[in-house]
């Protein structure tokens, strides 16, 4: 059965309750496998996200000659080969749906002595890659894209890279990370300056693997020729996955949930600030640090939300959470205004258009703009939603269904497994009204 017939029926359930274990952070899982593969020695990764995207990244490193053991679904033991130990692949390297994987690998593979080809699924094959290949070319890399700048990426090895001081025109952690990874192999120093600070997972984790790197919000610098030391990584729960339960508990009356050991990277948690601005009741407990990443338990209680102007300064820190925020805005009283979010148009789908269209289908008034939208809160009706194969759109409308006056059918939800395997089971256990139909 094709993924297009795999859908959810979402309707009002009960108040959400319980202490929930959210799967591991996707961004941290990608990087943990990559850096452990490049390290000298053996690294153990606990809390690894067993999703399609991260499995694709692990499979790519296996094709590059790295031995990776899987003692359990959430564990990986990586036998690092060192920065100069990767082997030429015998076939194209399939990144699946993972934009993070493809863009970071472009920076890494540009510095190798062998040629390689990076391919992806239908969605990834439409995403812009010149934002990465451009600065890598400035460093001496040779990477070919399609004529429109999309994958596949043909990476020509054997190039001598040199460090650059790159002033990025886009606020993108993936672009920054690709340049920094190439910089590990480059002659001299490489620096990246961003228009707005982005997530610093790469910088924090490189430091955890023993790389000397200077970084502060919006800036990072390292010198080439360094080696990585194996280290064990405990991956925190993925904040972007937790976001759907944060919003659901905030809008479903009577709800109270605890989300355990959630990653709270300060460049990732703009949604918390936005929801608190709207009146959400979210507290942080049991602060700790895992692999350089701050974590805490999040306690979320239902609270009536009110519309707000979302500060543009928060946008880069919540770029993956906007589908969830749009549902919170639909449930709030008054208007919520989002600006400065044009980046949403080049994610796994055009998320601005997909969310605006979907909410209108459910009777919510949404005024779309080139870089955002105004959402008029009110009643959420029933209807059939097309997720466009986008995992975050699908999960957002599963939440919307919890306040529906009828039911919401969400089509094409198989891709949820890329970031949140078991979402439907966890949601049902917490109190969601959610049925899965037409499994593949």
From Swiss-Prot:
<feature type="binding site">
    <location>
        <position position="351"/>
    </location>
    <ligand>
        <name>phosphoenolpyruvate</name>
    </ligand>
</feature>
<keyword id="KW-0963">Cytoplasm</keyword>
<keyword id="KW-0057">Aromatic amino acid biosynthesis</keyword>
<feature type="active site" description="Proton acceptor">
    <location>
        <position position="320"/>
    </location>
</feature>
<feature type="binding site">
    <location>
        <position position="27"/>
    </location>
    <ligand>
        <name>3-phosphoshikimate</name>
    </ligand>
</feature>
<dbReference type="GO" id="GO:0009073">
    <property type="term" value="P:aromatic amino acid family biosynthetic process"/>
</dbReference>
<dbReference type="InterPro" id="IPR013792">
    <property type="entry name" value="RNA3'P_cycl/enolpyr_Trfase_a/b"/>
</dbReference>
<feature type="binding site">
    <location>
        <position position="174"/>
    </location>
    <ligand>
        <name>phosphoenolpyruvate</name>
    </ligand>
</feature>
<keyword id="KW-0808">Transferase</keyword>
<comment type="function">
    <text>Catalyzes the transfer of the enolpyruvyl moiety of phosphoenolpyruvate (PEP) to the 5-hydroxyl of shikimate-3-phosphate (S3P) to produce enolpyruvyl shikimate-3-phosphate and inorganic phosphate.</text>
</comment>
<dbReference type="InterPro" id="IPR001986">
    <property type="entry name" value="Enolpyruvate_Tfrase_dom"/>
</dbReference>
<protein>
    <recommendedName>
        <fullName>3-phosphoshikimate 1-carboxyvinyltransferase</fullName>
        <ecNumber>2.5.1.19</ecNumber>
    </recommendedName>
</protein>
<feature type="binding site">
    <location>
        <position position="99"/>
    </location>
    <ligand>
        <name>phosphoenolpyruvate</name>
    </ligand>
</feature>
<comment type="subunit">
    <text>Monomer.</text>
</comment>
<dbReference type="InterPro" id="IPR036968">
    <property type="entry name" value="Enolpyruvate_Tfrase_sf"/>
</dbReference>
<feature type="binding site">
    <location>
        <position position="320"/>
    </location>
    <ligand>
        <name>3-phosphoshikimate</name>
    </ligand>
</feature>
<feature type="binding site">
    <location>
        <position position="174"/>
    </location>
    <ligand>
        <name>3-phosphoshikimate</name>
    </ligand>
</feature>
<feature type="binding site">
    <location>
        <position position="347"/>
    </location>
    <ligand>
        <name>3-phosphoshikimate</name>
    </ligand>
</feature>
<dbReference type="Pfam" id="PF00275">
    <property type="entry name" value="EPSP_synthase"/>
</dbReference>
<comment type="pathway">
    <text>Metabolic intermediate biosynthesis; chorismate biosynthesis; chorismate from D-erythrose 4-phosphate and phosphoenolpyruvate: step 6/7.</text>
</comment>
<feature type="binding site">
    <location>
        <position position="172"/>
    </location>
    <ligand>
        <name>3-phosphoshikimate</name>
    </ligand>
</feature>
<dbReference type="InterPro" id="IPR006264">
    <property type="entry name" value="EPSP_synthase"/>
</dbReference>
<dbReference type="GO" id="GO:0003866">
    <property type="term" value="F:3-phosphoshikimate 1-carboxyvinyltransferase activity"/>
</dbReference>
<comment type="similarity">
    <text>Belongs to the EPSP synthase family.</text>
</comment>
<dbReference type="GO" id="GO:0008652">
    <property type="term" value="P:amino acid biosynthetic process"/>
</dbReference>
<feature type="binding site">
    <location>
        <position position="26"/>
    </location>
    <ligand>
        <name>3-phosphoshikimate</name>
    </ligand>
</feature>
<feature type="binding site">
    <location>
        <position position="392"/>
    </location>
    <ligand>
        <name>phosphoenolpyruvate</name>
    </ligand>
</feature>
<feature type="binding site">
    <location>
        <position position="26"/>
    </location>
    <ligand>
        <name>phosphoenolpyruvate</name>
    </ligand>
</feature>
<feature type="binding site">
    <location>
        <position position="127"/>
    </location>
    <ligand>
        <name>phosphoenolpyruvate</name>
    </ligand>
</feature>
<dbReference type="GO" id="GO:0005737">
    <property type="term" value="C:cytoplasm"/>
</dbReference>
<feature type="binding site">
    <location>
        <position position="31"/>
    </location>
    <ligand>
        <name>3-phosphoshikimate</name>
    </ligand>
</feature>
<keyword id="KW-0028">Amino-acid biosynthesis</keyword>
<dbReference type="GO" id="GO:0009423">
    <property type="term" value="P:chorismate biosynthetic process"/>
</dbReference>
<dbReference type="InterPro" id="IPR023193">
    <property type="entry name" value="EPSP_synthase_CS"/>
</dbReference>
């Amino acid at each position: 059965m094709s993924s297009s017939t795999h859908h959810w029926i979402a309707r009002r359930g009960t108040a959400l309750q319980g202490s929930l274990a959210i799967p591991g952070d996707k961004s941290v899982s990608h990087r943990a496998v990559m850096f452990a593969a490049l390290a000298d020695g053996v690294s153990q990764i606990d809390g690894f996200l067993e999703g399609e995207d991260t499995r694709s990244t692990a499979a790519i490193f296996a094709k590059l000659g790295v031995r990776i053991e899987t003692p359990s679904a959430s564990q990986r033991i990586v036998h690092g080969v060192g920065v100069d130990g990767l082997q030429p692949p015998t076939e194209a390297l399939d990144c699946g749906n993972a934009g993070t994987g493809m863009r970071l690998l472009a920076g890494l593979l540009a510095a190798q002595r062998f040629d390689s080809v990076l391919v992806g699924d239908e969605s990834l094959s439409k995403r812009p890659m010149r934002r990465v290949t451009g600065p890598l070319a400035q460093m001496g890399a040779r990477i070919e894209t399609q004529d429109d700048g999309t994958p596949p990426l043909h990476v020509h090895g054997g190039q001598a890279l040199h460090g650059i001081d790159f002033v990025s025109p886009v606020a993108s952690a993936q672009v920054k990370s690709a340049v920094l990874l190439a910089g590990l192999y480059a002659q001299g120093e490489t620096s990246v300056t961003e228009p707005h600070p982005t997530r610093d997972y790469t910088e924090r984790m490189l430091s955890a693997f023993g790389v000397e790197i200077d970084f502060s919000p919006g800036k990072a610098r390292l010198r080439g020729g360094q080696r990585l030391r194996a280290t064990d990584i405990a991956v925190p729960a993925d904040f972007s996955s937790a976001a759907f339960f944060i919003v659901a508990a905030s809008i479903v009356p009577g709800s109270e949930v605890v989300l355990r050991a959630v990653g709270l990277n300060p460049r990732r948690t703009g949604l918390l600030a936005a929801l608190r601005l709207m009146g959400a009741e979210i507290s942080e407990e049991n602060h700790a640090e895992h692999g350089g990443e701050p974590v805490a338990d999040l306690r979320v209680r239902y609270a009536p939300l009110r519309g707000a102007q979302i500060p543009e300064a928060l946008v880069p820190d919540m770029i993956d959470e906007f589908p969830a925020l749009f549902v919170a805005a639909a449930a709030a009283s008054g208007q919520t205004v989002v600006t400065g979010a044009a980046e949403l148009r080049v994610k796994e789908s055009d998320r601005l258009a997909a969310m605006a269209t979907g909410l209108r289908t459910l009777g919510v008034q949404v005024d779309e703009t080139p870089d955002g939208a105004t959402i008029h809160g009110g009643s959420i009706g029933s209807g059939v939603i097309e997720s466009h194969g986008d995992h975050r759109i699908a999960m957002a409308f599963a939440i919307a269904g919890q306040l529906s006056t009828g039911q919401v059918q969400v089509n094409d939800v198989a891709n949820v497994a890329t970031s949140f395997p078991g979402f439907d089971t966890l949601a049902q256990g917490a109190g969601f009204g959610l049925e899965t139909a037409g499994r593949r």
